């Protein structure tokens, strides 16, 4: 009896800093070596609408993130000039400004437990504390503290979906149905017993 492993998907965005540093190939290589399949990929210049839809956060998120920024400012003896929730909103403003300032590479990675696997490969959101061996841990040393002081988005190379539900919400923002390919890889045929046209073998 064939074990039918779910084809989970994750959205990956190689951000402008990853593109500008010519890390596209190295980043894709990490995912493919692990056994994930690239079922969609394109380079584009994001629109403000795309980014605002993608980074759709609520007031609870703004307040939580903004409170952390206020604490960082206070530790450094720097002035706190607005309410915590506004600092939280500034995070999205700076991200949108940054993400629309240069090309990104949008990728759909597919495979068993794809969101968890991609997150593991990418590493923690804050580069300076990301584990060595992860993409962020190996290729950048930026931090929330430095980005807060500089009033800019943290340069952490990549966005990736944290879970299946997030991936299902994010993927349609960046890809149309016709841009997602169905095919099989040698990895799938060896481990999961699928046919060459991407269908499960009987």
Q: How would you label these PLM feature ranges?
A:
Residues 1-202:
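Non-catalytic terminal and connector segments of soluble metabolic enzymes
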